[in-house]
From Swiss-Prot:
GO biological process: one example: symbiont-mediated perturbation of host programmed cell death
Keyword vocabulary terms for this entry: Host cell membrane, Host membrane, Hypersensitive response elicitation, Ion channel, Ion transport, Membrane, Repeat, Secreted, Transport, Virulence
Comment field on protein domains: The glycine-rich region is characteristic of harpins.
Protein name per UniProt: Harpin HrpZ
Biological source species: Pseudomonas savastanoi pv. phaseolicola
Quaternary assembly: Homomultimeric.
Function: Harpins are proteins able to elicit hypersensitive response (HR) in non-host plants and are required for pathogenicity in host plants. HrpZ forms ion-conducting pores permeable for cations. Such pore-forming activity may allow nutrient release and/or delivery of virulence factors during bacterial colonization of host plants. Also binds peptides, which contain tryptophan and leucine, suggesting a protein-protein interaction between the harpin and a host plant protein, possibly involved in the bacterial pathogenesis.
């Protein structure tokens, strides 16, 4: 009876009850992730662990290290790394991410890993720039990813005109600040690559709770003022990138540019077809009365100019998107690469 009385007294003490309950909580864990997602987390944790501790030499390792330090788990072992990864994935990709993955096949398991890495890469893009005054600043820790973005911009000068430093890679070397115009250009690149990461993530199986595609939500352009979507090759070809002019525009100037473009195409050997040839013959001095008026000639040149513009715009858009898709894959592969391996690559 004395023993029963002692146990009852012990259990009535809040502090002692906490001591009794806490070890059980730590042992069982509190993850609500699906079994499939927990297996992915375990694989990632192994990749990020060196000598029993987190290796922070990779971009994902650095991100996880900051998260663990913020939660008081810096220097923790494998189980702490798993718990931090679990929390990070749900914070970045949604509470219900991977909820239906337990019903997936082995292929689905691989797809889930792809979704996790693409989703984390996309979220990291959104955190690369931090607002400061009338521009943004960036961290030296993020330089491996930033450099890939800058190289993408330098490879597509029609979409991203060179800054004063001569190249976007050089711009990153000058200091860790981008002014307003530079920030807009950089966020435009982030948005295009983010769309590719989102598309690749969705194509991997659509198991995530938040499967919405699109950009990063960064303020690349003001939708109230911009007449078209960001990076639309046809709009850029006609009005210039990120045009905020009135939607009516200067129609006369646009028509003049298209006619000039058509004339250049004809002189380059493109040809305008029979109607315009007839007009050219009829306009020779001393010839018969013209069979076509000047309007038909200008109409042919206008049509040819429009065709050339559309063709170039399509090639530009395809080139940028293809380049962005390649960079997106590179960024995903970089997540688990140490800084040393990145330098070798």
């Amino acid at each position: 009876m004395q023993s029963l009385s002692l146990n009852s007294s012990t259990l009535q003490s809040p502090s002692m009850a906490l001591v009794l309950i806490r070890p059980e909580t730590e042992t069982t864990g509190s993850s609500t992730s699906s079994r499939a997602l927990q297996e992915v987390i375990a694989q990632l944790a192994q990749e990020l662990t060196h000598n029993g501790q987190l290796d922070e030499s990779s971009p994902l390792g650095k991100l996880l290290g900051k998260a663990m330090a913020a939660s008081g788990k810096a220097g923790g072992g494998l189980e702490d790394i798993k718990a931090a990864l679990d929390t990070l994935i749900h914070e970045k990709l949604g509470d219900n991410f991977g909820a239906s993955a337990d019903n997936a096949s082995d292929t689905g398991q691989h797809d889930l890993m792809t979704q996790v890495l693409n989703g984390l890469a996309k979220s990291m893009l959104n955190d690369l720039l931090t607002k400061q005054d009338d521009g943004t600043r960036f961290s030296e820790d993020d330089m491996p990813m930033l450099k890939k973005i800058a190289e993408f911009m330098d490879d597509n000068p029609a979409q991203f005109p060179k800054p004063d430093s001569g190249s976007w890679v050089n711009e990153l070397k000058e200091d860790n600040f981008l002014d307003g115009d530079e920030t807009a250009q950089f966020r435009s690149a982030l948005d295009i690559i983010g769309q590719q990461l989102g598309s690749q993530q969705n194509a991997a199986g659509g198991l995530a709770g938040d499967s919405s595609g699109g950009g990063l939500g960064s303020p690349v352009s003001n939708t109230e003022n911009s007449p078209g979507s960001l990076g639309d090759p046809l709009i850029d070809a006609n009005t210039g990138p990120a045009s905020n002019s009135n939607s009516n525009g200067d129609v006369g100037q646009l028509i003049g540019e298209l006619i000039d473009r058509g004339l250049q195409s004809v002189l380059a050997g493109g040809g305008l077809g029979t109607p315009v040839s007839t007009a050219n013959t009829a306009l020779v001095p001393g010839g018969e009365q013209p069979n076509q008026d000047l309007g038909q000639l200008l109409g042919g040149l206008l049509q040819k100019g429009l065709e050339a513009t559309l063709q170039d715009a399509g090639q530009t858009g395809t080139g940028v998107q293809s380049s962005a898709a390649q960079v997106a894959l590179l960024l995903v592969n970089m997540l688990l690469q140490s800084t040393k391996n990145q330098a070798a690559a």
